Amino acid sequence: CVMQFAQTKDYILVRHTQDTILASYLNDMSKYNNLNEIKKTRLAYDNITVQLSKKNTRFQYKLIKKGGRASEFENAIEWLCLSGIVSQVYKVEQIKKPLENYRDIDAFKIYVSDLGLLCAKKDLTADDVLYETPEINDFKGGMAENYVNVQLSINGYRTYYWQSERGAEIDFVIQRDGKLI
């Protein structure tokens, strides 16, 4: 889509392509998923923007469905991760090496792998994203975090986050050249 826009400067054509990709995501959820997991996967996928709009972006199953629990949606989340549509960023209890050893498997955030598709999914325009738009300002913080996660991930970093008991948070913790950042 980026190349298409660079060549054509046509937002409508790009949005059509994005809509086609989003439709293929939904088709893949039906085609390559267990029958009893299709609805759960779609519910989880549709709920990602709700999760990103929350001040506390830690993933909450109860936001997918009232009374939702990990046991009900963990396969759906795993399918979305394995398909490359989303990524999980785990909370670490301590910022020590190796980070993987200190992750809390029950506390994580979910980010999408393509922000352009996220905007298309929610029918957001470039102006919505670039300029102050009170209707979506809560969502912009989650989008900014999502953007940082994508950039770190495409540069080969495994991302984690840390949160204190009182709520202070470091949005991203990575290991670079043997150092924790």
Where do the language-model regions lie?
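Accessory nucleic acid-recognition modules appended to NTPase machines
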Residues: 5-180
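The conserved phosphate-sensing helix
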Residues: 1-3
